[in-house]
From Swiss-Prot:
Its EC number is 3.1.-.-. The keyword RNA-binding applies. Residues 98-173 form the Smr domain. It comes from Proteus mirabilis (strain HI4320). This is Ribosome rescue factor SmrB. Belongs to the SmrB family.
């Protein structure tokens, strides 16, 4: 495939004869550029600080009062109980997913903090955390951590299509939501 297509000299002469006397047209058209969307790039230090700030609320010693019967669920005091019902029914579709499989507790805390910070930054209301079954360490700890965070409105065991009892759907408070 290294063969180049070469015109015979007679063809080149014919072409030059045909274009003899032509003039180059001046460029007189204005090219309009489409306006670009402003992409906000957050500095890495800011993202790391948000992650640290969000994971600040998680303590391993604190034991919130969570429901022991039925599926894992939590509703922040003063929040609308109908939101929890909509979570249970699967009315909310999570926009962000976090998979904690294979993570240590420390890294899982940091990742959950980063997820909550990202939800607030991107104005995402519903997210899904997949903690898995495993040795039940993250399955037990994740709800305890989430119940401590002030930006979590509610969480409920996910419906089967989002992970069933190996995942949690959570509602994150945003500035947009607080104004409603």
């Amino acid at each position: 495939m290294n063969k180049k297509f070469i015109l015979p000299p007679s063809e080149i002469e014919l072409f030059q004869e045909m274009i003899k006397g032509t003039k180059k047209l001046p460029q007189d058209k204005i090219r309009h550029q489409t306006p670009r969307k402003k992409v906000t790039h957050y500095p890495t230090e800011r993202l790391q600080q948000e992650q640290i700030d969000a994971s600040y609320y998680f303590s391993d010693e604190f034991q919130p009062n969570l429901a022991t019967e039925g599926p894992m669920r939590y509703l922040r005091e003063g929040a609308n109980a109908y939101e929890l019902k909509k979570l249970r029914r699967g009315d909310y579709v999570p926009e962000f997913f976090l998979d904690l499989h294979g993570l240590t507790q420390l890294i899982a805390k940091q990742e959950i903090g980063a997820l909550i910070a990202a939800c607030r930054r991107e104005h995402v209301y519903c997210a899904c955390i997949m903690h898995g079954h495993g040795k039940h360490i993250l399955k037990q700890q994740t709800p305890l951590w989430l119940a401590q965070h002030p930006d979590i409105i509610a969480f409920h065991q996910a419906p089967k299509e989002w992970g069933g009892d190996a995942a949690l759907l959570l509602l994150v408070e945003n500035d947009d939501i607080a104004r409603r």
